[in-house]
């Protein structure tokens, strides 16, 4: 039920936990009602730190859902102080462990049975919050008359620390947070005019990886209908870590903060008593090598949310049977290069040498054998025009983008479609006119989001007319997909987006010109990453060990030879002495 009191324009809705008050926002000559900061779980404080989220109890008053809630505790990116390009991703509300809240935007007048789109933010499972300006749901709600929902979930050690098998810190808490928010939507969205049987998950980067994990997690299956994955998938190399690795990282963190003991329960108890800030300061040191794309604490195969590695589940077809829409941006790698790859800077053109390219490979592929790195260098060298100055800069962008985002996303889509599900793939190639990063960084990771959420529609923000048209077309396709399982909807005037099949692999380009259809995106490079590179690792992964063993063996043999020689000399001198009698 909705009641309006005329003087304050507040909107009150009754949920299963109690009444909440929303706020009316003017959007493009109409109104959207927003409910910001609705609690969906008990605050994970004290003894609940590191545990799965617990359901909420009821409240008796009216909950004021008129402003964004706290963001979850996380480290802040301070690499480029005062620079909007990096700071736009930093939390814009207070940080707290009390952060399990969600937001709902509904059209007015209140719809009946509207399609729901649930956004899951990215940030490598280490950072992120639902209150960022680029995730504002009001434009999408107003233009497409869908209900938009977004939730905060725990990140970093507080969201993903794991001692596998121990209920005190089972791992994947951040994913269980998301799952509980999906349950909240199932129970409550009808009161907002939403249809619980028409729910599409969408997310970017680690958010898209999360969406694809919900596709692989049986408990999530009844909680949504369809899925959109922007620049991320669960089979990416940075995505899921083994139980062994997760456990080691927990023990390393415990050591750093002075919680090392034999007893696991004692370790967790000790970690619970530490200040959140101390955990944040130390969690960045748990990865033993200096890598630029490291997920310190992230999803694990816990046997509960995730029963096996994503690759295996995809192979076995253990996934939700539904439609997916997946895609990537043209320059997925550049965003990571300016955070420490040799020779790269946001303040110059970052023309790098072959040597710097090789140094870069060391940073992005720690632990990979020399032969492995050599094979990447060989595959990504432009042998036709070796002297072109931009070559190595573009090559490292491609290496990082192909390996971490583009090829895993294509592979996921291919496998998913092989199980008889309709899939649609896009390639986003428009560089926003508002992009604060330098020209050479191209169409960057994360910069399609503003077009999905309709930011270019706001006239006073100074996007170009062509960008407004592109944004409207993307919003229309995303909403069509959410409503009907097909981005084409009913209009015939725009380019039809073909279904992606594992044989032809057709995809659509998204840009300010007219969209085009191509086949087999980056086929050559992705064959390298999915087929050749794993073989190289398999064959050479233990070359270093073999070399060590050989050296040790040679050393032992050398010692035997020396000993034998000494014995022999000893023997001959004695023999000579005997012969002289």
Curated annotation (Swiss-Prot):
PROSITE patterns: CARBOXYLESTERASE_B_1 (PS00122), CARBOXYLESTERASE_B_2 (PS00941)
GO CC annotations on file: extracellular space; plasma membrane
Annotated compartments: Secreted
S-S bonds: 72-99, 259-270, 407-526
Pfam families the UniProt entry points to: AChE_tetra, COesterase
EC main group: hydrolase
Annotated protein name in UniProt: Cholinesterase
Organism name: Oryctolagus cuniculus
The gene coding this protein: BCHE
């Amino acid at each position: 039920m909705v009641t309006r009191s005329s003087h304050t324009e507040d909107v009150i809705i009754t949920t299963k936990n109690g009444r909440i008050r929303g706020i009316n926002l003017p959007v493009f000559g109409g109104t959207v009602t927003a409910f910001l900061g609705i609690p969906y779980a008990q605050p994970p404080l004290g003894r609940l730190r590191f545990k799965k989220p617990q359901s909420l109890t009821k409240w008796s008053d009216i909950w004021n859902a008129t402003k964004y809630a706290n963001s979850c505790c996380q480290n802040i990116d301070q690499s480029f102080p005062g620079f909007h390009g990096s700071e736009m991703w930093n939390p814009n509300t207070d940080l707290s462990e009390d952060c399990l809240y969600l937001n709902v935007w509904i059209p007015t007048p209140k719809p009946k049975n509207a399609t729901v789109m649930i956004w899951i933010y990215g940030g490598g499972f280490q950072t992120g919050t639902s209150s960022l300006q680029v995730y504002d749901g009001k434009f999408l709600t107003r233009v497409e008359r869908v209900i938009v929902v977004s939730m905060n979930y725990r990140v970093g050690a507080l969201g993903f620390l794991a001692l596998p098998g121990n209920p005190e810190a089972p791992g994947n808490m951040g994913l269980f947070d998301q799952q509980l928010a999906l349950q909240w939507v199932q129970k409550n969205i009808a009161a907002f005019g939403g249809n619980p049987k028409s729910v599409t998950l969408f997310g970017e980067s680690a958010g898209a990886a999360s969406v694809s994990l919900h596709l692989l997690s049986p408990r999530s299956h009844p909680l949504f209908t369809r899925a959109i994955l922007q620049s991320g998938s669960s089979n990416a190399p940075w995505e899921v870590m083994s139980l062994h690795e997760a456990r080691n990282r927990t023990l390393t963190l415990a050591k750093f903060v002075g919680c090392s003991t034999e007893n696991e329960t004692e370790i967790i108890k000790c970690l619970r008593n530490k200040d959140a800030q101390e955990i944040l300061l130390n969690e960045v040191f748990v990865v033993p090598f200096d890598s630029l794309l490291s997920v310190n604490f992230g999803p694990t195969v816990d046997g509960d949310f995730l029963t096996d590695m994503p690759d295996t589940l995809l192979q076995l077809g253990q996934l939700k049977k539904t439609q997916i829409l997946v895609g990537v941006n043209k320059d997925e790698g550049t965003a990571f290069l300016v955070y420490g790859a040799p020779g790269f800077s946001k303040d110059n053109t970052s023309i790098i040498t072959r040597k710097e390219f090789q140094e870069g490979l060391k940073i992005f592929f720690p632990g990979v054998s020399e032969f492995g790195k050599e094979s990447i260098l060989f595959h990504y060298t432009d042998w036709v025009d070796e002297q072109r100055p931009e070559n190595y800069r573009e090559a490292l962008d491609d290496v990082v983008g192909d390996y971490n985002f583009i090829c895993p996303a294509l592979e996921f889509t291919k496998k998913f479609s092989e199980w008889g599900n309709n899939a649609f793939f896009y390639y986003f190639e428009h560089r926003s006119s508002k992009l604060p990063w330098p020209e050479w960084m191209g169409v960057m990771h994360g910069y399609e989001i503003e077009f999905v959420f309709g930011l270019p529609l706001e006239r006073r923000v100074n996007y170009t007319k062509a960008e407004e048209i592109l944004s409207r077309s993307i919003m229309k396709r995303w909403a069509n997909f959410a409503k009907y399982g097909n981005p084409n909807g009913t209009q015939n005037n725009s380019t039809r987006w073909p279904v992606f099949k594992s044989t032809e692999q057709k995809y659509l380009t998204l840009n300010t010109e007219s969209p085009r259809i191509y086949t087999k995106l980056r086929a050559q490079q992705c064959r390298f990453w999915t087929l050749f590179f794993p073989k190289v690792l398999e064959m050479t992964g233990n070359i270093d060990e073999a070399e060590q063993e050989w050296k040790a063996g040679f050393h032992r043999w050398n010692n035997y030879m020396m000993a034998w020689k000494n014995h022999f000399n000893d023997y001959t001198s004695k023999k000579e002495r005997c012969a002289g009698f």
